[in-house]
């Protein structure tokens, strides 16, 4: 599953980066991974993304905005920020709802922060840059397994079948049905 998820994310980010280049727009791309940023990190490395935010590390919205602003000032108006879901858990305190509400974007009480809201924050902190967002989400989960992914799934079965016959575990376990 991991290899398949990474490959789907890499292809998606490459397509997004091609579009971002043609329209000169920075992009926030959120990938799945729950509390682990490995898929996001591997995707960012493979695609040359300029920034990465993962749940394992504390991060600051103002630092991300400053980095994006610097890239834009240097002529990179199409930077890509790859984020992992649950990265919000380690975001330094920032009243994002108040910031957006005070700056022309309505956010209702109880709404969780999202890639879309992060893009809106960055747009407002980076001089109106047209920052877009995409959540790859279930697309990465529903893809056909890669060759490596398929091999990884079959490996435990091969190991089981190669267990010594004298072992008490000579046949695969069966699920109890009640």
Regions found by a protein language model. Name each.
Residues 2-21, 26, 30-129:
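Accessory alpha-helical/coil subdomains and C-terminal extensions
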């Amino acid at each position: 599953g991991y290899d398949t998820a990474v490959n789907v994310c890499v292809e998606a980010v490459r397509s997004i980066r091609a579009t971002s280049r043609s329209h000169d727009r920075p992009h926030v791309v959120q990938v799945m991974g729950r509390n682990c940023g490995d898929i996001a990190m591997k995707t960012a490395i493979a695609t040359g993304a300029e920034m990465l935010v993962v749940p394992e590390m504390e991060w600051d919205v103002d630092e991300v905005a400053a980095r994006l602003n610097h890239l834009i000032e240097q002529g990179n108006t199409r930077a890509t920020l790859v984020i992992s879901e649950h990265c919000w858990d380690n975001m330094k305190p920032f009243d994002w709802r108040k910031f957006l509400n005070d700056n022309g974007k309505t956010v209702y009480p109880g709404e969780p922060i999202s890639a879309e809201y992060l893009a809106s924050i960055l747009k407002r902190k980076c001089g109106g840059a047209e920052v877009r967002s995409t959540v790859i989400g279930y697309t990465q989960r529903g893809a056909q397994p890669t060759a490596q992914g398929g091999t990884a799934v079959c490996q435990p079965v091969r190991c089981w079948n190669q267990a010594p016959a004298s072992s008490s575990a000579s046949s695969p376990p069966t699920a109890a049905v009640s």
